[in-house]
Every structure is written in structure tokens, then in C-alpha cells.
């Protein structure tokens, strides 16, 4: 009849873990599931593929360096901030998953794990820590990186075990076969991860989340302007919301600059040159104000820059509309910033980012050097060369490339 799915076909194609994970995380157990085979494939690629690649990255460099986790655990105080952050997020995850499973909400548990793997561990922690694994030596920083990533992977193997028993078993055994840290023959004999409140730093999590948000906005602007991340740009401008905001951004400034390939961040207090526009969100206003929606919408559309700034700063704004006092919330409006000459501008909630899109000769040369590094690394991969293999590179001479090589010679050599 075509109104049913053959489970054996799906399991044979995608595996039982991906099928189960999709069914559990796609909708609550007590709700009807609109089954979509493409969704199972996406889970296989996006979640399990990402987690597998993260383990593969760890295993590659751990084998090169002979890491066996024989060293004593480095205390939290001796670990870099990025390690303390991911361990804080990991313990927040442990608590969230434990609570969700205890409340019979496996959907929430699975989604929490997915967010951690994709947004925190793979797309942020591993990306920012790559150089720590690449570099030579066995200093504390490198040991901390290995211990931290190992802990994340081992913990994840236990967290996913109730939903993805086979993948969890393989991940756990592959890790434990090398280190022998646990004596259990199976992940399903191991204890569920314990929550360590002393490793949780909510302020650090908040600062890193702000860095993630700013980076996401800058990368979005780059994409809109067709400017690759490999092309360095001079600066971004951030309007200062308050002292706390400035201090938080300053604490993660170097991280932001590195991730989005920008030279500097400029904090501004005078935002008059930024042209902000506001429009009502009728879906939010309608249920809230009924017949008053139209006059309130007219009031919102007529708000000047001063009132918009007040609404952004305070989160709400009182107004008299048709002899009635109403409270306009940020969720009742859409605020956006128009681009200005030489800059691309975007905003999300109360946060505004302006990106300097002008390119100098020096920036172009550095961008060309980064492009070469990428091409050379791809050639290494295509030729099947190991990370440890030394190579000689020949670049065809021309005035533009000669200058770029001369000014970025050390960078090109060290990165390839």
C-alpha cells in the first residue's frame, strides 16, 4: 500500500543506531512520528559522522604522539580556558541528560547531546584546539588538550549508550583498548557519568556563548559579501551594550579574532552612524493586544533612534497608545541595521556587528598566502602524504605571487 516503512531496509541501509536516534530525537515518544528516511540519513551524517570524525581526529594525533593517558590528570586550574570551558559544558550536559532520562524524556536528552557534539565539541572546541595537537613536544598544554578531548569522547560514549548502544560500544572500546583506564569489558557495564559541579563555570560558558554568537554573525556577513574566511579583514565594530558586555568580549577577543580571521575589534559607544530600523512583529502583537495591534504597530514604525536604543538596552518600552499604557517588548519587534559604505552590518537581538569589508594590498597578499596553504594541504591529502612527511613546494613566479610569498614565507612553510 505504500503507507509503511520496512524497518529492516532502513536498518540495513543506515544501521540500528542512526534509526533509533532519529526516531527518539525527532519527536517525543508519546507523539506521532512523521517518518522521513532522509532524516535518518542526516542523523547518520551530521551526528554520528561528526562524532566519528572527532574521534578520528583525536586518534590520528594521539597515535602520532603516542598518547596513552598514563600521565596524572592535570588539575582544572592548570588547564587552558578553552579546556575548562568544554569540561564545564560537558558537566552541564551530564546533568541535563541525567535529568531528562530520569524524567522519561529521551528526546530532550538526545537533542542535548547532539547540540554539544555539533556546536560545542566539533565546531568550536576541536577547531580552536587543532594547533595544540599539531605542534611538536609534549608540554602541559598538549597533554591537557589530549586529556580533555579524551574525557569528552569517553563520557559521550556512556551518555549515548542508552540510545546508540553499538556506536557507544565501539567508541568506548577503541578508547579504552589503548589507555586501559577502565576495567569494564563493555560500556554497558560502566557507571553513568557523574556530574561534577566544581567543574562548572557558568560565567565562562556565558562568555564563550557570546564569542560563538559574534563569530556566527561575522561569518554570516562574510558569506553575504562573498568573502572567504581565508581572506583576512581589518576590523569589526561592536556597539558597547554595558560594562559587563565589554569585559566579556575582551576576555574572548583573541579567540574571536582568530576564528573569523579579523585583525582587531573596535568598541564603540556612539552608534549614531549606524542606521537602525524597526518594524512590528504582527504574529507577536496580535494575540497580545488584539484590536490595539494596528495603532501599536503604527507607534513602533514611527519610533526614532533614541527609542529604539532604549528598547534594546532595557528590553521593553512603555508607551501610551489610544489612551492606554502598553509595554512593548523586544520580542514584539524586529530590529535591523542597514549597511553603511565600506561596512557590512547585522544584528541579532540587542547585539550589533559591523564588519570592515575594505581590502588593502597587505590583506590581499595574506589572503593569497592562506589560499596557497589550503591548496597545498589538499595536494598533500590527494597524494596520500602523512602529516609528518616533509615536502618541497614550487610556485610559478609572477609579481603578485612573488610579493605574497616574500611577505608570508614563514607562515606558508609552517602551515604546510
Write out the residue ranges for each language-model feature.
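Feature 926 captures the class I aminoacyl-tRNA synthetase adenylation module centered on the KMSKS loop
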Residues: 1-12, 31, 40-416
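Structured mid-domain segments that build the active-site/substrate or prosthetic-cofactor binding neighborhood
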Residues: 25
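Non-catalytic, structured segments within soluble enzyme domains
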Residues: 21-22
Amino acid at each position: 500500500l505504500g503507507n509503511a516503512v520496512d524497518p529492516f531496509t532502513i536498518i540495513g541501509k543506515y544501521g540500528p543506531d542512526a534509526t533509533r536516534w532519529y526516531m527518539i530525537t525527532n519527536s517525543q515518544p508519546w507523539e506521532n512520528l512523521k517518518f522521513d528516511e532522509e532524516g535518518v540519513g542526516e542523523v547518520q551524517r551530521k551526528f554520528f559522522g561528526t562524532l566519528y570524525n572527532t574521534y578520528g581526529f583525536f586518534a590520528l594525533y594521539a597515535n602520532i604522539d603516542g598518547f596513552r593517558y598514563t600521565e596524572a590528570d592535570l588539575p582544572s586550574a592548570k588547564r587552558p580556558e578553552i579546556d575548562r570551558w568544554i569540561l564545564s559544558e560537558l558537566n552541564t550536559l551530564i546533568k541535563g541528560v541525567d535529568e531528562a532520562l530520569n524524567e522519561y524524556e529521551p528526546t530532550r536528552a538526545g537533542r542535548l547531546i547532539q547540540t554539544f557534539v555539533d556546536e560545542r565539541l566539533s565546531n568550536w572546541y576541536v577547531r580552536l584546539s587543532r594547533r595544540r595537537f599539531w605542534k611538536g613536544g609534549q608540554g602541559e598544554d598538549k597533554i591537557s588538550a589530549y586529556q580533555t578531548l579524551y574525557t569528552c569522547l569517553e563520557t559521550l560514549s556512556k551518555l549515548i549508550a542508552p540510545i546508540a548502544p553499538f556506536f557507544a560500544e565501539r567508541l568506548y572500546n577503541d578508547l579504552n583498548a589503548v589507555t586501559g583506564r577502565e576495567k569494564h569489558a563493555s560500556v554497558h557495564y560502566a557507571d553513568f557519568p557523574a556530574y561534577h559541579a566544581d567543574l562548572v563555570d557558568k560565567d565562562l560558558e556565558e562568555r564563550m556563548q557570546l564569542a560563538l554568537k559574534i563569530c556566527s554573525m561575522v561569518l554570516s556577513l562574510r558569506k553575504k559579501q562573498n568573502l572567504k574566511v581565508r581572506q583576512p579583514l581589518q576590523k569589526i565594530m561592536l556597539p558597547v551594550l554595558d560594562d559587563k558586555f565589554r569585559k566579556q568580549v575582551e576576555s574572548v577577543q583573541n579567540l574571536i579574532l582568530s576564528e573569523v580571521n579579523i585583525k582587531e575589534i573596535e568598541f564603540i559607544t556612539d552608534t549614531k552612524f549606524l542606521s537602525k530600523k524597526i518594524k512590528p512583529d504582527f504574529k507577536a502583537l496580535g494575540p497580545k493586544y488584539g484590536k490595539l495591534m494596528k495603532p501599536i504597530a503604527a507607534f513602533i514604525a514611527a519610533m526614532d533612534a533614541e527609542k529604539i536604543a532604549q528598547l534594546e538596552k532595557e528590553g521593553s518600552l512603555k508607551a501610551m497608545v489610544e489612551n492606554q499604557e502598553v509595554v512593548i517588548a523586544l520580542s514584539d519587534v524586529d530590529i535591523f541595521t542597514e549597511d553603511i559604505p565600506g561596512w557590512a552590518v547585522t544584528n541579532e537581538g540587542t547585539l550589533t556587528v559591523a564588519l570592515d569589508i575594505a581590502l588593502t594590498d597587505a590583506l590581499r597578499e595574506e589572503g593569497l598566502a592562506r589560499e596557497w596553504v589550503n591548496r597545498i594541504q589538499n595536494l598533500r591529502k590527494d597524494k596520500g602524504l602523512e602529516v609528518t612527511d616533509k615536502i618541497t613546494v614550487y610556485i610559478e613566479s609572477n609579481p603578485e605571487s612573488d610579493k605574497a610569498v616574500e611577505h608570508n614565507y614563514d607562515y606558508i612553510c609552517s602551515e604546510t
